[in-house]
């Protein structure tokens, strides 16, 4: 089989697991946490006459898939190489250039957008981490998917939906009909939480060495999850050396970065017990997929008397992108695994026997390591100047203003994004330091723009097409006056905000289009597909799915709009 689907690192242990999960044997197992309608006979819900004429109507199961860091650039590069699941999806409705319109192109803000229909300014999820000076603990840095009241140590946080301000599609489905079930599965807790929302029935994410759930979800672990965790425990006792797919030979080229580290030649090998490297191997996404397809059958999703929602976030593309960049053999091998995993999900949905709609997109884009990009003609590709770090700037300003060096003047996670002034300083001093910091940062050759919170507060909310938004408007879409920093710093294009490549060599998070643009693909069997190259927004996904489910939205209730998925004179959107 000469395709991306075929690559020899798909181990026998997973093949047997996949068979065990998707066959009907699991459907005979009784678990305590099942829905009252789980015993509904499979296939009893027949397609209505309306469904027969309009494949988008009568949906019993919505499946929303996010591929972490799957940029429009990656989609463009590999869409002609896909031979399986990703190729099949391209028979659907394809938006190759959808925009995360906001500036903070990180995992948590991006996932908060996908199924809420709102920009981060409304969801409240302005970054993966920010500073909340109202929390009682000493460390004021908070994680987007934690409840800080439950832990004094942010390194030992309790995953929670606490910070998400708005409802998700799943929350709206549950409000419309409490019998709807919301199941969320992901490699990252923040992805599962932000896509699932406030009312998940089942939520599973990778944590340390197994798939786990939220502390307040007390039901019995499904057989599917238990089986996958047992499989992980067994195969992690052995070394693994994945074999690179033959189609990736043209991407294999050695690149030396950092302290003589070599990347680009082959997918990562893993030693027994190395759970960190596990996240950049095919096993990471494959086990997440195994849980998703297993729960489709075990919970009989779509077979109740109300539509169900399954959200899936595949996190390995992001892990590979951070560790190796986007243009080496590592990412090519990862794309092969993605193609296979999507094929398995589609096969499970087809076997499930109920009408479904699948949407695939991403939480943000990404860019390659600057060292390789520069070799390939991107002359502006570079790493950030260490002098732009908040600590370095604090020291310089402390000298200028004759302030103590015992505490930082500014707090920030990295040079780009939100910067917070030290709240213990006098008000007049804070105002002077904010203006001084803005001036110094703005004059740095790697900085594109610096906005104060006051400036962003007074900027009108943008309404034009997202590719036309200026930097201030992009920052505005990520700005929450109660959570955002006193300064928002945007670096120039192709400046990687990692000064020294160690474990992370590449990243995202900028306001530039390579981080903002992602594909959106809507797919349902037997529907006429089309491609629309004109830009749309990721906030448009939720209103489009809500329309298919006939869940009404008031004008202006969300930032997104319904996308018409029917290429004929008929429409899948509410008639005005």
From Swiss-Prot:
Signal peptide span: 1-32
Cofactor(s) needed by this chain: Zn(2+)
Disulfide-linked positions: 108-144, 248-332, 562-573
Cofactor note: Binds 2 Zn(2+) ions.
SUPFAM superfamilies documented for this protein: Alkaline phosphatase-like (SSF53649)
Annotated Zn(2+) 2 binding sites: 318, 322, 508
Residues bound to Zn(2+) 1: 68, 107, 363-364
Any one GO molecular function term: metal ion binding
List of catalytic residues: 107
Residues holding substrate: 128, 188-190
EC number(s) recorded for this UniProt protein: 3.1.3.1
Family annotation (InterPro entries): Alkaline_phosphatase_core_sf (IPR017850), Alkaline_phosphatase_prok (IPR026263), Phosphodiest/P_Trfase (IPR002591)
Catalytic activity: a phosphate monoester + H2O = an alcohol + phosphate
Alphabetized CDD domains for the sequence: AP-SPAP
Keywords in alphabetical order: Disulfide bond, Hydrolase, Metal-binding, Phosphoprotein, Signal, Zinc
Subunit structure: Monomer.
PANTHER family referenced in this protein's UniProt entry, alphabetically: BIS(5'-ADENOSYL)-TRIPHOSPHATASE (PTHR10151:SF120), ECTONUCLEOTIDE PYROPHOSPHATASE/PHOSPHODIESTERASE (PTHR10151)
Function of the protein: Alkaline phosphatase with broad substrate specificity. Has phosphatase activity towards nucleotide and sugar phosphates with a preference to nucleotide phosphates. Has no phosphodiesterase activity.
Identification of the protein by name: Alkaline phosphatase PhoD
